[in-house]
């Protein structure tokens, strides 16, 4: 028996060599950007992940309470109506999900974790006399409350086996908004100001001015009330209301007038009609009719002027601040708010009132709005006001004091019914300058007063109205919050049921389980994930479309806008979008501007506002400290652009710097700058940041470019672009398309379907020391494209955490690769590229450059019918052997079979109802249980338009139904795979553990040994270990106690890891053998996957990244294509007229730079070939170092990359040169990319003409074209609009029930409509018979079309057209209008006349 012994030196050497063979990027992108980014881009899908994580899991260590727990705590405790019992929430726990993600995808079930909630039922004893409660009994129990869907690592959900994304929603932030009607309501055109308090949930409160300048309030958009009614209801009286809004002035009677205190501010710029006299000295300070200058007013104050004497007439028109009452009789001379008139002033004079407190209303800076409202208000005190509010809210019900109180309290002050949320409170505090903790989420009296005060100030011209479209007033609700709201609704429904249950059972005997019925809560969650407008089928066309879908922000959806009602303002780009929402990427069409994409660096803060990062500027020096700001906070700063020039210390070079301040662009002096952008691409979204030379494209075309990249189909061979932007790697990594290493380690095994990595470094207890990555092989995506992953590493490679191990669909070497680089010439060619058509070379089709694989899924179910069970079988009536050639003995198609339209995929027979039976037959049937003997063929056949290869078959059986041979074979295969995994994991675990053991045992003194020949006290060496089987090494005991403890720790870790492997294996085998959960009535389900290879063909849509889209018009043989001087034919010919009017010049820059990249690649290739020739007759270990290649690479990449290239090993240099042969990849980041000078320099370096144009020759004649033509490499994409999916031909298909005309559309197997204009064309040609045929036998003449069919079958070619069915429908419609229309045939003249007479009578 061979023993496993690892020599220590060998072990360490292998470790070192493995680390030496470290992971380095196989290919370098030459970057043109100069701006160094100080902060890493946040993970692109963390928005989704963080939001859901915060919803699901509390973090006790930092005191964070999860959204789920908050929701549960807001509904519990539930008390019964009598107060005898209460059901309280203790904690919740999410268990391990029953199936993992892959199993859920295959079985079509939801990936979710069972949720257990610990509830406590407390029963009280209520003393009937004192009504005190004492606890009688407390019971705790864990209650199962349904499954909570879990998010996958990539930010998606699996609901019923399909991958879905919950899109974030943008809505109006809770808080207060001040606005005006822009003068549209009233004919005079004056602005009517309004304020609205928007809660997170609860009643809306609107304050508004009307045309008469009265301030009104509406609750929940109901009838309006004077605002003072609301203030009375809050407990204020008239005097308090007036005092809150106005200052008072004390008037004291003097000689010949009234004395008032002198306030300089109120006299500046006024022109008095009377002499203004010093109240103390009696001299004239300001003469009548002379304007008082601000300087004179201030001087008078400084000279000691304190009181003025003004004539009595001047006091008229002021308003009293208090009630003036005759103390002795209680008679009111003048009420608070009343106007002072000669009449009531005379009364006051007679009563001897010498001082008056009047309101400071000057009708200039302070208007009498609240005073006027108070006087117009019918209510006079709190009770009146409450009754008035009650009448508005509940019209027709008589108010009592208690119900009115309760209603008013419940509207705004009851946390159960009204919730501003923390966000709303923060917004309220900021707008109204209040200081209230964000835990107070109901309204307070002072909040309402502050809102009214601010509204009145606006009317008086103080302050600004808010901008609704500012991102400071719109917030984002992500998955967690949306689900939390939905779950709360479900829990509240459940609460009602629980309360009713509590009052109907004996609480002392039941357990919490008997009271709770979790169905409403579970249904709410299921409904949210299954059918909410924001839960969408994930766009899986390519990795970019996945990432953008998860980063989408929609203003539509429940509680949001609707397409029809959204105006232009909401959709428009706003200055606050900068760095938060992309101004480019949004759909064309009705949703434009309503569906947006987050910008690259933006993130969402805890209040739901979008933040973007900036670098701080301290003492005029730009630091590397980064702060994230929301739109509200940003308005205080002046922000410089990311491309502002800095010197080595970080100071601005220019005196004036291009900057943004309060939404405006300006040139600001450098001392004024307080922040600076982090990166030029923080402005745009992920898709837009992938467009090179974006800055040279028109915005409309850039929008199309970003949208079309999301529709690019993944091709059979991915190729990264020559001209990229440097974002390709980030997208590939964050989308999860390429597999990244979770932990560092050494690659142990690699094959096409899995990668096994032995982890290095410390392994956490209970975690396996082995990572197995399963690769997806030819799986179907949501869009029927093909998901296929290919390993990039080889055995023995050392990988770091985060390194790319395998490429996925549309990725190459860990970079996003949506299309292919092709050689393009810009020139017209015989009209084949007129109006954006594209002419392509046959080489592209022949070499499968744009070939893609599409996988269709077909499923068939065998159900239990009334007449007996359906059966999946090969034995089908009336079907020849030829039709069954692809089926196995179970009647299911083989994997690898090539199928054509109409071929049987799964044979299935269904029992058929027979002719009526006699009673005797029925009786026999009932006794012997025979089911129907007659069957019909209901097999699954391949629909028209699909032909391909079967790549996968899955059979699902109901629990308890016998499995057929095919199902058994699939199950055996699965178990073999699981066994192999288990054995590999064990082998690696053993290897790693024994190496550890050996390290710890060598050189130790034996205290006990597994075999007698090893004596106590001996030293352990290699020979000792070699004489014992490795699995018995655990039985060694050593004298060193510390070392012995280490050995025991290794043993415990080994045992627990081994146990985990065993358990995982058994669990998976059990799942594979267990029956599947199928829909009710289904016995068996078979899914068949057909792969179709789609080559490029005329009618397919292609596009570049700059919005330059077109349809292929012709595929031309390569020899007819225009060719270069060296004989290379171009791949694609585009029309140059497509560029000027579209203004997407980026494509021309890309062409030139791509041409240079190809030329530089050729230089590297020649160097590599020279080196290979020099070493042609040497062995590998004797090769000369590839210095010539290294030098050439340094020359191509420039000094910036010299260090990196010099530090690489010879082997890596050769490998990298091999990857650069076709072209050197370059990156030109958006807004910081290659300048025209850089492109010229690259072209010169590659030895090409720096005009970017070459002489082309006509492929058909061989003659040179008159002028040079722009030729270069463009990255072209094949879009998901394939002609194969659109074109179809109808033979005999379904007809509409009413009109009997053929249906329309491919899905209904419909015909082409011969419409009004087409009829005109035939009429114009006089083609009467053709037209008659079109309108009758080819359409809806039911009898006629049957006769035509019979005639054709008999070989006869005479037939007659009858009456179209649509004529009959018309007649019936006229009947329904009471018009009798019938067809009469005339036999003779007189008969005809008589019938007319009858009709006339």
From Swiss-Prot:
Keyword Iron-sulfur: no
The UniProt record lists the keyword Transcription: yes
Catalytic activity: RNA(n) + a ribonucleoside 5'-triphosphate = RNA(n+1) + diphosphate
Keywords: DNA-directed RNA polymerase, Nucleotidyltransferase, Transcription, Transferase
InterPro entries to which the protein is assigned, alphabetical: DNA-dir_RNA_pol_bsu_external_1, DNA-dir_RNA_pol_su2, DNA-dir_RNAP_su2_dom, DNA-dir_RNAP_su2_hyb_sf, RNA_pol_bsu_bac, RNA_pol_bsu_CS, RNA_pol_bsu_protrusion, RNA_pol_Rpb2_2
GO biological process: DNA-templated transcription
Enzyme class: transferase
GO MF annotation terms: DNA binding; DNA-directed RNA polymerase activity; ribonucleoside binding
One of the record's GO cellular component terms: DNA-directed RNA polymerase complex
Enzyme Commission numbers on file: 2.7.7.6
Pfam families, per database record: RNA_pol_Rpb2_1 (PF04563), RNA_pol_Rpb2_2 (PF04561), RNA_pol_Rpb2_3 (PF04565), RNA_pol_Rpb2_45 (PF10385), RNA_pol_Rpb2_6 (PF00562), RNA_pol_Rpb2_7 (PF04560)
Superkingdom classification of source: Bacteria
SUPFAM superfamilies, per database record: beta and beta-prime subunits of DNA dependent RNA-polymerase
Annotated disulfide bonds: none
Residue ranges the record marks as coiled coil: none
Role according to the record: DNA-dependent RNA polymerase catalyzes the transcription of DNA into RNA using the four ribonucleoside triphosphates as substrates.
Family membership noted in the UniProt record: Belongs to the RNA polymerase beta chain family.
PANTHER family, alphabetized: DNA-DIRECTED RNA POLYMERASE I SUBUNIT 2
Subunit structure, interactors included: The RNAP catalytic core consists of 2 alpha, 1 beta, 1 beta' and 1 omega subunit. When a sigma factor is associated with the core the holoenzyme is formed, which can initiate transcription.
NCBIfam families reported for this sequence: PRK00405.1, rpoB
Protein name (database record): DNA-directed RNA polymerase subunit beta
High-level lineage: Bacteria, Pseudomonadati, Pseudomonadota, Alphaproteobacteria, Sphingomonadales
């Amino acid at each position: 028996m061979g023993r496993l012994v690892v020599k220590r030196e060998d072990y360490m050497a292998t470790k070192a060599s493995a680390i030496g063979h470290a992971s380095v990027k196989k290919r370098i992108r030459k970057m043109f950007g100069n701006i160094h980014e100080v902060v890493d881009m946040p993970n692109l899908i963390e928005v989704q992940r963080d939001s859901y994580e915060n919803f699901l899991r509390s973090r006790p260590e930092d005191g964070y309470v999860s959204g789920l727990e908050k929701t549960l705590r807001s509904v519990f405790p539930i008390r019964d109506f009598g107060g005898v019992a209460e059901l309280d929430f203790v904690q919740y726990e999410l268990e391990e999900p029953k199936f993992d993600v892959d199993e859920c995808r295959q079985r079509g079930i939801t990936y979710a974790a069972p949720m257990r909630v610990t509830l406590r039922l407390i029963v009280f004893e209520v003393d009937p006399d004192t009504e005190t409660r004492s606890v009688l009994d407390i019971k705790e129990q864990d209650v199962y409350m349904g499954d909570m869907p879990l998010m996958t690592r990539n930010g998606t959900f699996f609901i019923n086996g399909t991958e879905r994304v919950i899109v974030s929603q943008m809505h109006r932030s809770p808080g207060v908004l001040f606005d005006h009607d822009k003068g549209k309501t009233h004919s005079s055109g004056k602005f009517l100001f309004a304020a609205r308090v928007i809660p997170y949930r609860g009643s809306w409160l609107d304050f508004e001015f009307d045309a008469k300048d009265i301030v009104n309030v509406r609750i929940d958009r109901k009838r309006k009330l004077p605002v003072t009614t609301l203030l009375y209801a809050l407990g204020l009286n008239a005097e308090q209301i007036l005092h809150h809004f106005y200052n008072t002035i004390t008037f004291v009677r003097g000689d010949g007038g009234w004395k008032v205190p002198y306030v300089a501010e109120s006299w500046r710029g006024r022109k008095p009609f009377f002499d203004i006299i010093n109240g103390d000295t009696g001299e004239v300070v300001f003469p009548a009719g002379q304007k008082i200058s601000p300087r004179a007013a201030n001087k008078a104050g400084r000279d000691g002027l304190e009181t003025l004497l003004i004539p009595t007439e001047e006091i008229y028109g002021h308003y009293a601040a208090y009630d003036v009452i005759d103390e002795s009789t209680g008679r009111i001379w003048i009420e608070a708010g009343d106007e002072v008139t000669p009449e009531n002033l005379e009364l006051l004079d007679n009563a001897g009132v010498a001082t008056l407190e009047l309101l400071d209303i000057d009708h200039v800076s302070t208007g009498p709005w609240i005073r006027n409202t108070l006087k117009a208000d019918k209510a006079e005190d709190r009770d009146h006001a409450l009754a008035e509010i009650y009448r508005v809210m509940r019209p027709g019900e008589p108010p009592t004091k208690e119900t009115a109180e309760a209603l008013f309290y419940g509207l705004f002050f009851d946390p159960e019914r009204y919730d501003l949320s923390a966000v709303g409170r923060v917004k309220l505090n900021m707008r109204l300058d209040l200081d209230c903790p964000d835990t107070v989420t109901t309204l307070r009296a002072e909040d309402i007063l502050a809102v009214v005060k601010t509204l009145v100030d606006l009317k008086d011209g103080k302050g600004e109205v808010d901008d609704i479209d500012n991102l400071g007033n719109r917030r984002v609700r992500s998955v967690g919050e949306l689900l939390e709201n939905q779950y709360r609704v479900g829990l509240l429904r459940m609460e009602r049921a629980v309360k009713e249950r509590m009052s109907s059972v004996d609480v002392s005997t039941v357990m919490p389980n008997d009271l709770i019925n979790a169905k409403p809560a579970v249904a709410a969650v299921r409904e949210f994930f299954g059918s909410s407008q924001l839960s969408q089928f994930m766009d899986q066309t390519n990795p970019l479309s996945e990432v953008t879908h998860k980063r989408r922000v929609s203003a539509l959806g429940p509680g949001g806008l609707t397409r029809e009602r959204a105006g232009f303002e909401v959709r428009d780009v706003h200055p606050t979008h900068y760095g938060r929402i992309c101004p480019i990427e949004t759909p064309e069409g009705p949703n434009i501007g309503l569906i947006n994409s987050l910008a690259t660096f933006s993130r969402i803060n805890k209040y739901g506002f979008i933040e973007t990062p900036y670098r701080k500027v301290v003492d005029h020096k730009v630091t590397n400290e980064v702060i994230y700001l929301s739109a509200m906070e940003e308005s205080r700063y002046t922000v410089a652009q990311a491309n502002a020039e800095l010197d080595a210390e970080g100071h601005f070079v220019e005196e004036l710097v291009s900057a943004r301040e309060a939404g405006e662009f300006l040139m600001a002096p450098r001392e004024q700058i307080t922040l600076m952008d982090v990166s030029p691409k923080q402005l745009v979204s992920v898709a837009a940041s992938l467009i090179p030379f974006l800055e040279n494209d028109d915005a409309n075309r850039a929008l199309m470019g970003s949208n079309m990249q999301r529709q690019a189909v993944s091709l059979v061979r991915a190729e990264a672009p020559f001209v990229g932007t440097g974002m390709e790697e980030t997208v590939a990594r964050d989308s999860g398309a390429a597999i990244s290493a979770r932990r560092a380690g050494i690659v142990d095994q690699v094959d096409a379907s899995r990668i096994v990595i032995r982890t290095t470094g410390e392994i956490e207890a209970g975690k396996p020391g082995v990572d197995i990555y399963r690769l997806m092989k030819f799986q179907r995506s949501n869009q029927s494209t093909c998901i296929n992953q290919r390993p990039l590493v080889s055995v023995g490679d050392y990988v770091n955490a985060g390194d790319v191990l395998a490429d996925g669909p549309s990725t190459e070497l860990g970079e996003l690769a949506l299309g292919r680089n092709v050689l393009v010439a810009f020139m017209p060619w015989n009209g084949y590229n007129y109006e954006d058509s594209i002419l392509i070379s046959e080489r592209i089709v022949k070499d499968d450059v744009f070939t893609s694989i599409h996988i269709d899924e077909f499923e068939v179910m065998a159900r239990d019918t009334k007449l007996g069970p359906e059966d999946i079988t090969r034995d089908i009536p009336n079907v020849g052997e030829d039709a069954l050639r692809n089926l196995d003995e179970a009647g299911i198609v083989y994997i690898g079979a090539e199928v054509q339209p109409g071929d049987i995929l799964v044979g299935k027979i269904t029992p058929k109802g027979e002719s009526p039976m006699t009673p005797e037959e029925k009786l026999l049937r009932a006794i012997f249980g025979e089911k129907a003997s007659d069957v019909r063929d209901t097999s699954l056949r391949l629909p028209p338009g699909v032909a391909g290869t079967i790549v996968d078959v899955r059979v699902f059986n109901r629990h308890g139904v016998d499995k057929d041979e095919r199902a058994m074979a699939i199950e055996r295969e699965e178990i073999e795979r699981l066994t192999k995994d288990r054995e590999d994991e064990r082998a690696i675990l053993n290897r790693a553990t024994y190496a550890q053991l050996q390290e710890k045992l060598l050189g130790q003194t034996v205290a006990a040994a597994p075999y007698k020949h090893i004596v106590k006290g001996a030293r352990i060496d290699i020979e000792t270990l070699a004489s014992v089987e490795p699995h018995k090494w655990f039985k060694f005991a050593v004298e060193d106690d510390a070392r012995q403890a280490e050995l025991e720790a290794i043993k415990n870790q080994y045992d627990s890891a081994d146990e985990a492997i065993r358990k995982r294996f058994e669990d998976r085998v059990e799942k594979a053998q267990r029956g599947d959960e199928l829909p009710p009535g289904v016995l068996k389900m078979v899914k068949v996957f057909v792969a179709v290879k789609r080559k490029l063909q005329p009618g397919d849509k292609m596009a570049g990244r700059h919005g330059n889209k077109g349809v292929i018009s012709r595929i031309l043989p390569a020899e007819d294509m225009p060719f270069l001087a060296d004989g290379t034919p171009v791949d694609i010919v585009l029309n140059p007229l497509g560029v000027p009017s579209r203004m997407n010049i980026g494509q021309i820059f890309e062409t030139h730079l791509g041409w240079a990249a190809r030329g530089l690649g050729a230089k590297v290739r020649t160097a590599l070939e020279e080196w290979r020739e020099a070493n042609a007759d040497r062995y590998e270990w004797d090769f000369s170092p590839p210095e010539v290649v290294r030098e050439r690479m340094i020359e191509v990449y420039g000094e910036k990359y010299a260090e990196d290239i010099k530090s690489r090993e010879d082997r890596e240099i050769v490998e990298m040169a091999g990857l650069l042969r076709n072209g050197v990849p370059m990156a030109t980041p958006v807004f910081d990319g290659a300048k025209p000078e850089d492109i010229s320099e690259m072209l010169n370096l590659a030895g090409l003409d720096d005009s970017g144009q070459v002489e082309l020759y006509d492929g058909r004649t061989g003659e040179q074209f008159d002028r040079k033509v722009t030729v270069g490499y463009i990255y072209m994409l094949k879009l998901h609009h394939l002609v194969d999916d659109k074109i179809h031909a109808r033979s005999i298909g379904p007809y509409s029930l009413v009109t009997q005309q053929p249906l329309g559309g491919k899905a209904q197997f419909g015909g082409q409509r011969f419409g009004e204009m087409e009829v005109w064309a035939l009429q114009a040609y006089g083609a009467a018979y053709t037209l008659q045929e079109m309108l009758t036998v080819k359409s809806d003449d039911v009898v006629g079309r049957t006769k035509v069919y019979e005639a054709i079958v008999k070989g006869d070619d005479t037939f007659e057209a009858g009456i179209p069915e649509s004529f009959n429908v018309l007649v019936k419609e006229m009947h329904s209008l009471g018009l009798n229309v019938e067809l009469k045939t005339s036999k003779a003249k007189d008969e005809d006349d008589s019938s007319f007479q009858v009709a006339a009578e």
